[in-house]
Amino acid sequence: VVAESRALAEDALEKIIVDATPQPFILDAEVALLVTSVPVHPEHGSNLLLDRKFVWGPVDDDFNVAEHSLSFSVTWGRNSTVPIETFGVLAEWNGWDQMLDIWASIQMPKYADQITRSLNLPSNAIRVHYDVDVGGSYGVKRGIKHSVLVGYIARKLGCPVRLIEDRLENMRAGDAHGPERK
């Protein structure tokens, strides 16, 4: 929903009815990799993204002649962090210059590159204003999906668009969550 104010957007959201069929899901990554598991994207045929072996030198030979070897699995749990301030972004499209200006509470390398690639823009068609006061991120405010969305809408509508997460939005759908990994 795009609206002139947050109140209007929230009122409009109440009028939306979503008719969705719940899909099967798997929370354990190792179970998801089993051939018997339902693929997240059926057209891919499996839940495996990449199957590649990286080898530097005669690793198997080195292990065969080693007196001792150690094998173990490392797991760290899912985490959620709470930045002091939630993510905010403002985008403005200048149709004359074909330039997207982004102001965001971000401290991230390759931010501009990720936005231009997602929006299919040349890399010199974006100006990111990093001069916004930013604090309390602790490395978790990425905001790429927010910035791409706001940049797209600003370009489509031809007017400045901003998105400021509230705390509930940040906890539900922000970028401050890390998956469980093995």
Regions found by a protein language model. Give the residues of each.
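Short, solvent-exposed amphipathic alpha-helical segments in soluble enzyme
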Residues: 16-18, 116-121, 179-180
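General beta-strand structural signal in soluble alpha/beta enzymes
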Residues: 70-74, 102-104, 126-130, 161-166
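Short acidic loop-to-helix transition motifs that present clustered carboxylates
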Residues: 76, 109-110, 133-135, 167-171
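Glycine-rich and small/hydrophobic secondary-structure elements
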Residues: 1-12, 16, 138-182
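Short, histidine-centered active-site or binding-site loop motifs used for metal coordination
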Residues: 93-97, 130-134, 167
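Extended, polar/acidic
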Residues: 1-114, 139
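Glycine/serine-rich anion-binding loops at beta->alpha junctions
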Residues: 126, 133-142
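Proline/glycine-anchored alpha-helix kink/cap motifs
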Residues: 89-95, 113-125, 148-163
